[in-house]
């Protein structure tokens, strides 16, 4: 069984600030905000939600099929996917754009300030989900706005169950659009902040959202996960990390585990437990695709 992973392929530039943002930003001066952070360390990684989720799913033994767009500078990413044994058959190159780029600054409390250039990602609507016998599952992760809308409709038309994972793109949709996403999807996953925004915009609380799908999974950081099914919440405890080094990509690592469990017919609670475990391993390593994990 293969899973289509709709989302971005991106290059991440990750910088670490050896202080606290809260000590540099004055709340009463936000109207004239002008700050600069000295970042002694800088690293460039392969990233993007589709790439990160595919990496996690592949580590676990699944079959990811990322559906994404890259730019004229994306050849090295194709080489990366080939080296990992991940198919790029649904990856399209946009010659007049750059691959999406994320600029991330993390402070000592693991707070992050991000800048994101979408580049070729905004052309992801040029890719298309179609029914195929080996494709049994999908996920819509943060991607170009039009692509997310079209892919949700295409998954539904192809009768492929999928996870709706709006992430940082959630603010780009209004309440009616988000309600439609929920109604088309089979599962929804968000972090606690995104969950509050999703509830605010749809007018549905977590219990109500869970009644429209087979399950709602809410990650709550160091506290683990909440699984909502038919209005009933189950808490899935966190796994203590060996070290807290870099949160970048933890949510995507979790979602790869979620897909693996769904591919194998697991309960959502078991999926969430694996997600917590993989996330705890990822956070102990720098970068979204530099950790190792095995179910053996």
For the regions a language model picked out, list residue spans one by one.
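Hydrophobic anchor at the start of a short beta-strand
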Residues: 3, 63-65, 88, 162, ...
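Conserved phosphate-binding/catalytic loop of the ribokinase/pfkB sugar-kinase fold
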Residues: 89-94, 102-146
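A glycine-rich beta-to-alpha transition motif near the start of alpha/beta enzyme domains, typified by
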Residues: 63-90
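Gly/Ala-rich phosphate-binding loop of Rossmann-like dinucleotide-binding domains
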Residues: 58, 156, 263
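Conserved phosphate-binding/catalytic region of the ribokinase-like
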Residues: 203-296
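Active-site metal-binding loops of divalent metal-dependent hydrolases
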Residues: 9, 143, 253
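Glycine-rich phosphate/adenosyl-contacting loop at the front of the ribokinase-like
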Residues: 1-65, 76
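Conserved phosphate/ATP/ADP-binding segment of small-molecule kinases
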Residues: 150, 156-163, 167-237
